[in-house]
């Protein structure tokens, strides 16, 4: 595939919304071995992006998807692990405010994912209920990068119409 006359690597990702979600997906921890096999099969077939979120999981299983991925990564050969990108999304819950609102959730996600975190995304826009919250959280992600954490910043489920001006170029 060419984009602006440059070859672009084709990517296919494994989404993990259902992992840990009892409410919508009837998750049971008894099925974790099946999820491990799904993960392994995805890697065998060339999937190189694993998508998750700190909110994937319900109730006391919050973050369960990240925890499972982190566990599976421990048994992934290092050559395969290097080619995988792990993307998570941090939920802009109303209590996560200000330019430090993502610090704790980011560190918890990093821990659950065993320090394999390549892309961190704002999960959805706050424009409809707390428009002032969004810019602070995006700046917080930039601050984390400035502190030495190495990841790309992304947006998920956000229409560009609702995004704040770029926190930093």
Where are these regions (language model features)?
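Active-site beta-loop-alpha junctions enriched in small/polar residues
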Residues: 17-19, 55, 89-93, 122-125, ...
